[in-house]
Amino acid sequence: MKGLVIKTTGSSYIVRMNDGSDAECHVKGNFRIRGIRSTNPVAVGDFVTVEDGWIMDVEDRRNYIIRKSTNLSKESHILAANIDQVALIVTVNHPVTSTTFIDRFLATCEAYRVRAILIFNKIDLLTDEELAQLADLRALYESIGYETLALSALDLNSATSNSEASNAEGSNARSAINSLFAGKVTLLSGNSGVGKSTLLNALFGRELTRTGKISDAHDKGMHTTTFSEMYFLEEKNERTKDEGNLSPFTFHPSALIDTPGIKGFGTIDFEREEVSHFFPEIFRASQECRFSNCTHTNEPGCAVQQKIITGDIAISRYESYLSILDDTTEGKYRA
C-alpha cells in the first residue's frame, strides 16, 4: 500500500496512507536509497510503499534539501523531500542569523532547484538601527531575485509588506503568508530560536508545537521541535469511499513541514567549478570573466572582482561564496 511520510521520530515514521489512515512504520537496518548516503534514508515528504508496517520502497524524489549533519561530519541529513519551496525563517536579532548561514541555505536551494523565500521574523523586537539593517538585507536579497517578507509571528494581523504578494491597503502578514503558502508544500527551516514553531502555531490558531525561550547567556535559540513533521493547511475536498487510493495532497493541497532548528549549514557534493552557479549574481557576472574557468579568487580579468569593487556584488555574499569554495577543498564548513 502506498502513502506519504508526514512525520519522522528517529526510530519510526508516521505515514499518511492513501486511504486517509495514519500508520506507524519502520525501516530495516540495511535500508538505503541508491546514490544517497544520509543519516535518514526516509524523509518527510517521501512517497513510500508499505507492507505490514515496514517501508519497503521510496519513490523517486522530485527534489530534496540536504545538509551535512554536524560540523566536520561526513554524514548528511535530508531535511525534506518533494517540496515546492523553502521558507527560511531568519532574524536580525534575538538570535542573530548570519548571512553565511542564509547564503549557504540559499545556495543549496539553487543547487537542488527549489524556490526559496526569506521570512524575517521578530521585527517587533528590533531597534531603529536593526530595522535599518533589516531594510538593507531585504534590499540585498530582493536585488538578487529572492522574495522576502518581514513580520512578527506574534502578530500576524499587523500591516506588512513583501516583494511580490499584494500590498493593497489592508494587507497584513497573515494574508501575505497565506498567499505564499497556498497550494504548495513548504519546508520551514532556520536557526534554533527564530520562531518557526511560533509562526506555525499562529497560522493554525492553536499550539501544534512547543515554543521555547532564547538562552540569556548567548542569545542563542534552544531546540523545541525535535522531529520533522508535515502539517496540512486546509481541506480541499471530502474523501469519499470511491477515493480511497489517492494521494493526501488531493485533499490537502497546502502543507508545511516543520523541522528542528539548525545551527550551521554544511553543503553537500558541490563541485568547485559549480559553486558560482548557485550565487545568481556571481554567475551572471562570471559570463564576462576573461577565463571560462575563473574561480573569482585571484585570476586576472575577473568580472566578479570588478563587481565587488563597484558594489554590485555584496562583500557578504562573496565571503559566503569563498566559504563554500573552501568546503570543496577541505571538506569542512563553518557556520
What would you call each of these model-derived segments?
Residues 1-10:
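Structural detector for short beta-strands of small beta-barrel domains
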Residues 3, 79-101:
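Glycine- and charge-enriched low-complexity intrinsically disordered segments
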Residues 22-40:
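Beta-strand/loop nucleic-acid-binding surfaces
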Residues 83-90, 113-123, 145-150:
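Conserved beta-strand/loop subsegment of P-loop NTPase cores
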Residues 100-115:
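Histidine-anchored nucleotide/phosphate-binding helix
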